[in-house]
């Protein structure tokens, strides 16, 4: 019996509720490693700034996410949760939340059909037609929950938007929307009617929001959490620096030292990935389209090449671009026998995985596959091209996720409590003083001692003694 069928009479869909005690023990450990998030929980618990908030959450269902969910609840929110990736759920984390009463719809290894079913179910807060039928807030990672509302609402008026799916993902999404409309023709309009805003976790999701905002089609307010400095410069860089190689090692037990590793993309995620591979003494090459990022890579001592050049020479390939078709079928056809291919960007289309379906696949273990080419060459594909650090590992450490999730919580409070200050259809970032607040809270765990400005020094550089210390244009 699948997780989905087990939950037909219950308001959750998880793998195994008996894992809850294990999950709870790990949640307690994570809480001790998440100082900023726990400090915000303590600061706002009495005032309940999220009382009345109905939060639809679509974000990797991990132990660290469980701490975020319970923080939102401690501040007064009602929460329904699904994972934003079919492989990223930690089943014991999901079980712990369900045991505590949270509706969670996630298990590791979901089908795409289950994924979109679960994403629909996190919008079902109350009876049809009631004032509390749907959410009034979305917390998103990658933008799928936001996409579902927008595309579904468009399809209510024009079914042709679902006519030409371009991928397996789109085929399942479009089928799910068609099925929902067949049973309830105004479901998306009603579910989206009360949504005040969305807070978005990732670069990919932010790009989607900005595109909709530019076109004038974004239905609600949005806060770009990704570009908070204490998110992008820490989660994206330092988180990936630890979790990438953890995922690769767990999946393959490969010796990294001496091998040629190619990192596609040298943004914050690529920078962390390159640092991690070099720390294990790999020869790291970088591919880039942006001359500024390419120059940064070169100045750090990395060799900057094209994927066409690297394809038949490297041993390990990592995509970190947020784009599509970065590693093509032709690239993989040229690769060495036993080359390792993985992705730490958001979606699986960075690698042309669909082009490999015509070949024989041999599962080595869950999320680790040999792809056998006609000449019997094999490449090792990790997590089927989805996030390797969460598909083959446990994702980022708790400490760095504390910064990200503290920003998410602050953003939820800000949008819910002060929605009138934000214009519908616009994308905002959190102010600098809140970024600095998160950093201060994180530093306490490290026993760091901050130097304090005198009033004379503050006047000299034109800031307050309490900050903010940098202009919004400052690049950390």
Curated annotation (Swiss-Prot):
Pathway: Amino-acid biosynthesis; L-homocysteine biosynthesis; L-homocysteine from S-adenosyl-L-homocysteine: step 1/1. PROSITE patterns: ADOHCYASE_1, ADOHCYASE_2. CDD domains: SAHH (cd00401). InterPro entries: Adenosylhomocyst_ase-like_sf, Adenosylhomocysteinase-like, Ado_hCys_hydrolase_NAD-bd, NAD(P)-bd_dom_sf, S-Ado-L-homoCys_hydrolase_CS. Binds 1 NAD(+) per subunit. Keywords: Cytoplasm, Hydrolase, NAD, One-carbon metabolism. Its EC number is 3.13.2.1. One of its GO terms (biological process) is L-homocysteine biosynthetic process. Belongs to the adenosylhomocysteinase family. PANTHER family: ADENOSYLHOMOCYSTEINASE. This is Adenosylhomocysteinase. The lineage of its organism: Bacteria, Pseudomonadati, Myxococcota, Myxococcia, Myxococcales.
